[in-house]
A protein has these predicted regions:
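Conserved PLP-enzyme active-site core in the AAT-like
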Residues: 1-288, 292-301, 306-322, 330-347
Length: 347
């Protein structure tokens, strides 16, 4: 079975498992785990910040970032299909008392003018003052779309001008960095806080980082305990993340190339794929109104895909465990599954 549902499905490689088995460990809560300490040091440098904190998940990292950047009653601006908005169970409100305002995005992005238009008077006793702006890069629901560097810089500059905190949900930041041909620090370094997930393109079983200034990360360590993210001998997990930073970043270009090959092959076969959308490792396929039937037929042909926020669209995501041969098999199988469910044969 070729599993293209998500890049969260990767399995640790044999070499990563060896690194896990051989990890030096200590009490992470006492800052005595040497492997965690090394990951936090290197992770901060990788993300362009003074300090980083190791956490179990990127969702926890996002929620800690929002908690330390705002206060109850503040307003948070995000693109309306962002992970923070749709897939974190109302966390900004539940955990931090934040009012989340969704901006209408294009390809998962929004403009400085949109930010400025939503800035609320902090002196008013009637409104929630705008305090935080969050960017997601790459953008999951938009299909792995990448923010251009100049747009990132413009958003950060606007936030600085208007004294707004700015957070980067960088769950797939490494995909954006590889697509732009720049270090991750070039994208994430200008934000107040940035998160990175290790269990997607980097192929780890779990783990995430939040990075920022020393002062903010001191607050993040308190947030780590508050959210139940403090661990003990966490070096066995941090070792996987260190291995990934050494061995799995550059190879992400292979995932992107395979996604492009899949999209082009399906387009040649008459399947409705938006080629312009394929910027990283996501391919969005319009299968028509019988999406459930198309997914079932693809499974019968040995290919697993997942749904998206769009009712006629499925996604295929390339990752560490998808080979060139898998892509060619999928190119042969998917058109048969789509046409047999009556989907359109391309735009």
């Amino acid at each position: 079975m070729i599993d293209l549902r998500s890049d969260t499905l990767t399995q640790p490689t044999p070499a990563m498992r060896e690194a896990i088995a051989n990890a030096a460990v200590g009490d992470e809560q006492k800052r005595e785990d040497p492997t965690v300490n090394e990951l936090e040091r290197r992770g901060a440098e990788f993300l362009g910040h003074e300090e980083a904190v190791f956490l179990p998940t990127a969702t926890m990292a996002n929620q800690i970032a929002l908690q330390i950047l705002g206060r109850p009653g503040d307003a948070l601006l995000v693109e309306r299909h962002a992970h923070i908005m749709l897939s974190e169970l109302g966390g900004p409100a539940a955990h931090s008392g934040l009012l989340t305002i969704g901006l209408e995005g294009t390809k998962g992005r929004f403009s400085p003018d949109q930010v400025v238009s939503e800035i609320r008077d902090r002196t008013s006793v009637h409104v929630a003052p705008t305090r935080i702006v969050a960017v997601e890069n790459t953008h999951n629901s938009a299909g792995g779309r990448v923010w251009p560097l100049e747009e990132i810089d413009a958003i950060v500059a606007t936030c600085r001008e208007h004294e707004l905190a700015v957070h980067l949900d960088g769950a797939r930041l490494v995909n954006a960095a590889v697509a732009c041909g720049v270090p991750a620090a070039r994208i994430g370094g200008g934000f107040d806080t940035v998160t990175l997930c290790f269990s997607k393109a980097l192929g780890c079983p779990l783990g995430a980082l939040i990075a920022g200034s020393h002062e903010l990360m001191q607050s993040a360590r308190r947030g780590k305990h508050f959210f139940g993210g403090a661990m003990r001998q966490a070096g066995i997990v941090a070792a996987a993340a260190l291995y990934a930073l050494d061995h799995h970043v550059d190879r992400i270009a292979d995932d992107h190339a395979r996604a492009r090959r899949l999209a082009e092959g399906l387009t040649e076969a008459g399947v409705d794929v938006d080629l312009e959308q394929v910027e990283t490792n996501f391919v969005q396929i319009d299968v028509g109104p019988d999406r459930a039937g198309a997914i079932d037929r693809m499974k019968e042909h040995g290919v697993l895909v997942s749904t998206t926020v769009h009712p006629t669209v499925v996604r295929a995501v390339t990752h560490l465990d998808v080979s060139d041969d898998d892509i060619e098999t999928a190119i042969a199988a998917i058109p048969e599954a789509v046409t047999r469910t009556g989907a359109p044969a391309g735009r």
